């Protein structure tokens, strides 16, 4: 899938976090600044097709990424959204939010490439500091 290629480095991305099992990167269509996708490196079509141990590890990784996002973007909460109809590869959307209106996938914010790079680097650094 496209997410497998991104996680493998075959397609460029703004990396926010990674480990042996999972990869997190900025969504190219930012709903809010800091909108991050978390994917398993192993191709799994649907999040609930993952076995229990994989799903638990996936959520723990996403939680750590969410904590890093909240460090960079002080907000009330980091929303976790699972949709998965566009790409047949399990993934979690993490979005900094201060109200439910911030999680409107019909709305996107324009974030220039240089700013996306800076955001990803800040989230990556915050993620590393949580180690």
How would you label these PLM feature ranges?
Residues 1-131:
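HIT superfamily nucleotide-processing domains
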């Amino acid at each position: 899938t496209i997410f497998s290629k991104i996680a493998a480095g075959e397609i460029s991305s703004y990396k926010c976090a990674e480990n042996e099992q999972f990869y997190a990167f900025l969504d190219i269509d930012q709903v809010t600044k800091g909108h991050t996708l978390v994917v398993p490196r192993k191709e799994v079509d649907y999040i609930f097709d993952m076995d229990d141990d994989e799903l638990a590890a996936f959520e723990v990784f996403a939680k750590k990424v969410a904590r890093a996002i909240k460090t960079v973007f002080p907000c009330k909460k980091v929303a976790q959204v699972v949709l998965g109809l566009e790409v047949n590869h399990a993934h979690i959307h993490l979005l900094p939010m201060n109200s439910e209106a911030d999680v409107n996938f019909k709305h996107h914010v324009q974030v220039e490439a240089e700013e996306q790079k800076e955001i990803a680097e800040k989230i990556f650094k915050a993620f590393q500091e949580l180690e």
